[in-house]
């Protein structure tokens, strides 16, 4: 809640920074950004008046004015990161800010030009969007506060947003904030007069198609009406032309004119690009998506979440290449091979004309926003991968290789004359690396003199289309080769770091960790986690199957990244209040070697696939507005998933602290079970002693169940006594070591009592029964503070 209150206070401070002098009184807040040039010219006049009165340097005024605004924007970005919003101004705003400050400081003689350059930057064009976004955030904050408050008071106070201007959509399905669309100022005035009570949860946003004169008429109606009004208009082109003509009349230097024209033309092009962005506003808004060169704003929706992760990567594969190699053998034994590569364009690179025909778009370097070097997209590379003979046959060049190369070059020249296309190859994703990469002038080919190579076309398309950059990719579809370390991973010791229901905050990114361990509780450093640094992502979750279910039982996407050697990090974005369950199970295909030993001890399985869920799966997350769960909710959530999680029941009567650790209750419950078990063991020992005494006294008080044992084993009574005593000591030691193990767990300790099986009694004393003990000592090593993990996505 502190972050939300800081966000409200910051929005009010930002609005007061650009507040007009004609604000109504009695607490109503009015922000006028109707015409950016006119509004900031008034600010410029005020600065000149202050400069004349105080006789200060105008450059200092410009610097102080720009620095305060930039500090506000940086503060807003930091708050928005904590709030879980991917905002604008990460690249455009800060980069343009540096350029404009250097230009303003260099031209210190002409103050009017420097102020215009500062005013007409993308910074001030984005201020209206930031203020509008803040007003929408305030409405969502009011709604969430009322939602939490209505659970007790059961009052309905719905926030209303009055949108004056043109709206694109009028859908009334499952939206969060009610929006009343009014096309003109007259309709809005008539509507506001019909409102009987002054609603504090009402906001007004005036769109850019309303003229300034009409806005002033609307302001006259709000003398005593506590409504937050956001007015914004973009720059008018007619006013710009008039200003250009006036400046051309006053200016005399032709060089200065050319520079000014070039600067203004660039600014106009940037403004036109920004003005093309459409705002999809509905009656009940769910999210606001503003596109500034792949920078998205998402507030609250589960459908936009997938695009939220995908578009943050800023990567689009332009081509998908399919390679087919055929080799023919003649009667004389000579081989003729041909290798053809055809690029297939994706949907992102194909546009539809008005006639319905497909038209290929131009390949601009600006479309590819990856961190990779763009030169590799314009060059042809040849690879020489060092792999086994199952994929490619690598050998030293021979005379036959040279003959094949010459034949292939001749065939390629003939194909080029006919109209063959030149090969163009692009790596399918950023995680795919090409080793031994070197540019050549010829086309890519593989020399295979001793073996015929046939590449499956469908298999290669699956490898390139289903890349590991998708955050919700499953390990079975990733086509990753099973490495030797996968056989070491054991589902009994691999675990989530959090073993109790975790409280998370709606609107913040929640993270957890998964540790891959073997049967001896040692970490398993896979190639993917050990070769990449911490924070690298997105990656595939192989060899784990991960599923994330939301409050409405829908499958949600998640983001998988590297935390350390053998440690996965899982992040997701909770957008609504409710319970999120993240479950993980071991991939059955990638762990066949490890499962063969376990299948022998599972009643032969009868052909049924065994449940390979890792420890603490599923992990439960409760998302609320304040990120707090009561102890009763923890107990109910824990007990509801007891069958799946194989954990004991909780007892909250012993403690009164709100910050409860699940390990305390596990230890307490196990101590109680151990006390009961010790009592049972003492009773068992007494019963065994009594039975042994009865056997030594010629079986005077034999039971019906032990007649056969006493008749067949009269000569081995002393050995059985010693064996039973040793067996009870082993049981007590194993029970004390496994305090966190439940008594009723199927994979837990097998308690051995006085009624042993007939097979064991008939066997020799050397063949002692084996104890199936699951090592659960990892749970005690978990840090208590690591259960509630909150992370933010870096912009």
From Swiss-Prot:
One of its GO terms (cellular component) is mediator complex. Residues 228-280 form a coiled coil. GO terms for molecular function: transcription coactivator activity. Residues 242-278, 326-430, 455-484, 673-743 are annotated as: Disordered. InterPro entries: Mediator_comp_sub12. Residues 251-264, 732-743 have a biased composition (Basic and acidic residues). Residues 265-278, 362-373 have a biased composition (Acidic residues). Residues 377-398 have a biased composition (Polar residues). Keywords: Coiled coil. Signal peptide: none annotated. GO terms for biological process: positive regulation of transcription by RNA polymerase II. Residues 326-345, 399-414, 455-480, 673-729 have a biased composition (Low complexity). This is Putative uncharacterized protein DDB_G0285031. The lineage of its organism: Eukaryota, Amoebozoa, Evosea, Eumycetozoa, Dictyostelia.
């Amino acid at each position: 809640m502190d972050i939300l209150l800081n966000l409200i206070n910051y929005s009010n401070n930002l609005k007061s920074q650009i507040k007009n002098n004609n604000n109504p009184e009695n607490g109503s807040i009015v922000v006028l950004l109707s015409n950016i040039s006119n509004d900031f010219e008034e600010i410029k006049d005020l600065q000149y008046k202050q400069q004349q009165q105080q006789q200060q340097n105008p450059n200092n005024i410009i610097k102080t004015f720009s620095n305060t605004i930039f500090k506000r924007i940086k503060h807003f970005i930091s708050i928005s990161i904590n709030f879980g919003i991917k905002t604008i101004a990460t690249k455009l705003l800060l980069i343009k800010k540096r350029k404009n400050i250097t230009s303003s400081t260099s031209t210190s003689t002409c103050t009017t030009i420097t102020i215009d350059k500062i005013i007409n930057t993308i910074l001030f064009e984005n201020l209206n969007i930031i203020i509008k976004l803040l007003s929408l955030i305030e409405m969502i904050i009011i709604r969430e506060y009322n939602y939490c408050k209505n659970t007790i008071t059961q009052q309905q106070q719905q926030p209303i947003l009055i949108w004056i201007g043109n709206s694109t959509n009028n859908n009334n399905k499952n939206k969060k904030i009610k929006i009343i669309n009014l096309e003109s100022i007259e309709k809005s005035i008539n509507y506001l007069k019909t409102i009987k009570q002054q609603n504090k949860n009402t906001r007004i946003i005036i769109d850019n198609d309303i003229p300034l004169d009409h806005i002033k008429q609307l302001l006259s109606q709000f003398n005593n009406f506590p409504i937050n009004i956001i007015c914004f208009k973009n720059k008018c082109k007619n006013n710009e032309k008039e200003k250009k003509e006036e400046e051309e009349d006053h200016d005399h230097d032709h060089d200065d004119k050319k520079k000014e024209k070039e600067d203004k033309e660039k600014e106009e092009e940037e403004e036109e690009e920004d003005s093309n962005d459409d705002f999809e506003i509905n009656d009940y808004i769910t999210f606001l998506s503003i596109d500034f060169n792949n920078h998205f704003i998402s507030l609250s929706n589960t459908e936009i979440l997938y695009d939220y992760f995908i578009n943050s990567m800023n990567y689009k594969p332009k081509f998908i290449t399919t390679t087919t190699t055929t080799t023919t053998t003649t009667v004389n034994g000579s081989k003729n091979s041909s290798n053809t590569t055809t690029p297939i364009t994706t949907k992102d690179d194909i546009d539809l004309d008005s006639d319905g025909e497909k038209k290929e778009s131009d390949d601009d370097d600006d479309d590819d926003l990856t961190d990779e070097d763009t030169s590799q997209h314009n060059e042809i590379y040849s690879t020489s991968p060092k792999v086994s003979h199952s994929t490619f046959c690598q050998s030293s060049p021979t005379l036959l290789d040279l003959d094949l190369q010459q034949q292939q070059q001749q065939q390629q020249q003939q194909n080029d004359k006919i109209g063959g296309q030149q090969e163009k190859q692009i790596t399918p994703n950023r995680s795919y690396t090409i080793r031994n990469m070197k540019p050549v002038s010829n086309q890519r080919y593989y020399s295979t003199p001793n073996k015929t190579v046939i590449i499956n076309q469908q298999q290669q398309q699956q490898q390139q289309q289903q890349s590991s950059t998708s955050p919700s990719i499953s390990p079975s579809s990733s086509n990753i080769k099973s490495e030797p370390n996968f056989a070491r991973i054991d589902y009994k010791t691999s675990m989530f770091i959090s073993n109790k229901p975790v409280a998370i905050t709606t609107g913040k990114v929640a993270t957890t960790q998964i540790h891959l361990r073997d049967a001896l509780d040692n970490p398993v450093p896979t190639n993917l986690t050990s070769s990449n640094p911490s924070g690298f992502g997105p990656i595939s979750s192989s060899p784990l199957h991960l599923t994330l279910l939301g409050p409405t039982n829908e499958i949600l996407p998640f983001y998988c990244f590297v935390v350390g050697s053998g440690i996965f990090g899982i992040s997701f974005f909770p957008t609504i209040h409710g319970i999120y369950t993240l479950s993980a199970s071991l991939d059955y295909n990638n762990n066949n070697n490890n499962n063969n030993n376990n299948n022998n001890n599972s009643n032969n399985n009868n052909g049924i696939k065994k449940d390979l869920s890792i420890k603490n799966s599923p992990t439960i997350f409760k998302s609320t507005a304040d990120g707090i769960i009561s102890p009763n909710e923890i107990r109910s959530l824990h007990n509801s998933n007891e069958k799946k999680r194989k954990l004991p029941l909780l007892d909250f009567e012993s403690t009164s602290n709100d910050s409860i650790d699940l390990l305390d209750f596990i230890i307490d419950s196990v101590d109680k079970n151990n006390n009961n078990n010790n009592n049972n063991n003492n009773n068992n020992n007494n019963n065994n002693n009594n039975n042994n005494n009865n056997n030594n006294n010629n079986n005077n008080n034999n039971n019906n169940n032990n007649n056969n044992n006493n008749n067949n084993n009269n000569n081995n009574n002393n050995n059985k006594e010693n064996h039973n005593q040793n067996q009870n000591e082993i049981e007590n030691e194993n029970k004390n070591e496994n305090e966190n193990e439940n008594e009723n767990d199927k994979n837990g300790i097998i308690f051995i009592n006085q009624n042993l099986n007939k097979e064991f009694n008939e066997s020799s004393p050397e063949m002692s029964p084996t104890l199936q003990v699951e090592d659960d000592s990892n749970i005690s090593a978990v840090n208590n503070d690591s259960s509630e993990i909150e992370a933010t996505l870096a912009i």
